[in-house]
């Protein structure tokens, strides 16, 4: 089937447009952001949050963010807990996966002093036990992109850096999310929704925008893939280079193309899956935010062991860097160089 990557309804998208064009919100924010969220438009309208600022698309040394950045504060006893939202594909879904300004998006969140990044993405399932409407917390990635996307801050002439990527996601972040596994529901069916998580759960990232052939889909299964999308690379790599704990929540919409005798998929089924996924994404995001606002988890305080790692990863000596290169580095790490 032709998987629809935007996991939220047009109505919610229009609602977001109103939020993101609200001239009454300040266009500057001088506080500290605790959590960055990258994903679909419906996540901007959570009951536990109140928008307090709407930053125009942020200009970074690596381009401009894919959308304005909405800053919201927690509605409750800890109103100092702030969340920054970026729509990965733009307000009107105008950026295809290959053209998303991934470096600008992640750099903006880093510049806002985010402590962690939570990402949402629609995926196709490569395994029979991961059903449409199920959610997955992957811990590994197979990169099948084509080298078209800018995937590093440290790959330009005059700057060399190598970061470890053996564990591309934050296991502590995933475990934190997994405590809410019983919160997602499937009210329209007797079939329950599941949140899948283990250390070998793997997401395949393909270039797109076309979807897999049947042969490719079967190959990805042989590789050990569990789900497939077009967004996790280079997002996860850039989060690592920014020393940010990062976890993607994958939302299954279909079985990709590997099933030889798949039943025809109807428009009603697709819309139902997308609607249910959007509802559960809101539920899960709300639970995570409410819990974090009550007590920020340790992995966010400590950076999950990533803090300071970039100092050891840059091979180029500062005295050999150009002024422009140093300015770019200081945008991400103002206290390192």
UniProtKB/Swiss-Prot annotation:
What are the EC numbers? 2.4.2.28
| GO CC term, one of those recorded | nucleus
| GO BP term (any one) | purine ribonucleoside salvage
Q: At which positions is phosphate bound? A: 41, 88-89, 121-122, 231
Q: Report the top EC class in one word.
A: transferase
Q: Which GO terms describe its molecular function?
A: mRNA binding; S-methyl-5-thioadenosine phosphorylase activity
Where does it localize?
Cytoplasm; Nucleus
Please classify the protein's predominant subcellular localization into one broad category. cytoplasm
Site feature: Important for substrate specificity: 212, 267
Name the source's superkingdom: Eukaryota
Annotated substrate binding lies at 230, 254-256
Cited function: Catalyzes the reversible phosphorylation of S-methyl-5'-thioadenosine (MTA) to adenine and 5-methylthioribose-1-phosphate. Involved in the breakdown of MTA, a major by-product of polyamine biosynthesis. Responsible for the first step in the methionine salvage pathway after MTA has been generated from S-adenosylmethionine. Has broad substrate specificity with 6-aminopurine nucleosides as preferred substrates. Seems to be implicated in the regulation of the expression of the ADH2 gene.
Q: Return the protein name.
A: S-methyl-5'-thioadenosine phosphorylase
What is the species listed in this Swiss-Prot or TrEMBL entry?
Saccharomyces cerevisiae (strain ATCC 204508 / S288c)
Task: Identify the taxonomic lineage of the organism of origin.
Answer: Eukaryota, Fungi, Dikarya, Ascomycota, Saccharomycotina
């Amino acid at each position: 089937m032709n998987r629809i990557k935007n996991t939220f309804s047009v109505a919610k998208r229009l609602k977001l447009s109103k939020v993101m064009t609200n001239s009454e919100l300040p266009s500057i924010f001088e506080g500290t952001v605790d959590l960055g969220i990258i994903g679909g438009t419906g996540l901007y309208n959570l009951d536990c949050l109140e928008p307090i600022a709407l930053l125009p698309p942020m200009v970074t040394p690596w381009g401009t963010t894919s959308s304005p950045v909405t800053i919201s504060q927690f509605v409750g006893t800890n109103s100092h807990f702030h969340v920054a939202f970026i729509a990965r594909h733009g307000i009107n879904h105008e950026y295809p996966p290959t053209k998303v300004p991934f470096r600008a998006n992640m750099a903006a969140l880093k510049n806002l002093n985010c402590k962690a990044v939570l990402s949402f993405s629609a995926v196709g399932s490569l395994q029979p036990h991961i059903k449409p409407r199920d959610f997955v917390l992957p811990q590994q990635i197979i990169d099948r992109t084509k080298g078209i996307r800018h995937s590093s801050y440290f790959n330009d002439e005059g700057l060399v850096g190598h970061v470890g990527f053996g564990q591309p996601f934050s296991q502590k972040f995933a475990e934190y999310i997994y405590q809410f596994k019983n919160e997602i529901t499937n009210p329209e069916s007797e079939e329950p929704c599941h949140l899948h998580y283990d250390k070998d759960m793997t997401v395949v990232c393909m270039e797109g925008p076309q979807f897999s052939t049947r042969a490719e889909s079967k190959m990805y299964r042989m590789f050990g893939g569990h789900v497939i999308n077009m967004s996790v690379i280079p997002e996860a790599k850039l989060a690592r280079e920014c020393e940010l704990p990062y976890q993607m929540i994958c939302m299954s919409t279909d079985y990709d193309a590997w099933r030889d005798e798949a039943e025809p998929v109807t428009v009603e089924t697709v819309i139902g899956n997308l609607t249910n996924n959007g509802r559960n994404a809101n539920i899960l995001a709300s639970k995570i935010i409410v819990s974090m606002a009550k007590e920020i988890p340790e992995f966010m305080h400590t950076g999950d062991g990533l803090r300071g790692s970039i100092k050891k990863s840059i091979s180029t000596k500062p005295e050999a860097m150009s002024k422009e290169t140093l300015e770019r580095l200081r945008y991400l790490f103002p206290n390192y160089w």
